[in-house]
Amino acid sequence: MFSMNRNPRIVCADGFSMSVQAFSSSYCLPRQDEGPHTHMEGGFPSSPPLDPELLESRENAYEGNEGDPCETVYPYVAREVFEREFELHGGIVEGRLPY
């Protein structure tokens, strides 16, 4: 059975969690299965992200959409932005960023 969720959900020390994916049919750069990837697709965080640049990536992608920040995808986010977000939550305790 095919699963679109190829990379396990990342969980941080404070309980924050988020899906981060990088493969040919996700919003990543380069848009291929093999890494390294400079930008990745995040999605469905357990609470609104803290990093302003991560929030901005969603706002830029879905201009005018004021929907729930926990029920959406964050496209083409730089690896460094995800690293900062996870550090703001005490660091990764489960999972890892895609390569």
Please annotate each region the language model reported.
Residues 49-99:
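Low-complexity intrinsically disordered segments
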Residues 31-54:
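Short secondary-structure subsegments characteristic of cysteine-rich extracellular domains
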Residues 2-38:
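Amphipathic, interaction-prone secondary-structure segments
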